[in-house]
């Protein structure tokens, strides 16, 4: 198996990674980045997908982990270069569809909604969607199965036992897959060097509402 990062490493944003095994390529996420201060006149930064265009016959589709711009924002631009089906969860698909409408791509783009716990087959790959928790709902981690072994792609995540909506992250499923053996783990590492634990989104929400109420009262 070849793992080909096309963006998102050692930077914030523009997350996109290709997984290749023989005649099959699947692409996880397709995000954009925002320009640095010295990038004058540039509004958005999108990934270089030359490799995907050069191997278009192998590419089976985009698999999207969640609906933040740094994971989906480049889709309308990339789809104009190489039209591929999109696989993701319901809420994430809804966000993507709004973008596709803006770019007149909705009718020409194949889409499939996938539930957590469900798997899809794309060429030589089988991809399982695993429930994750993040600051946006319906986030997924992925178990990417191939004849070479299984790769776990966490997507963006936090271990949140009290999310605002829905179930907590499915740590049991990670453990079950881990017992069988994993070829590689690709993990979100944002703030990994900071001490302590990430707050639950429920706590973040209460803190934000309390602060807003206090500011309004002071005014």
Question: Whereabouts are the PLM-identified features?
Answer:
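His/Asp/Glu-rich metal-coordinating catalytic cores
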Residues: 1-63, 68-215
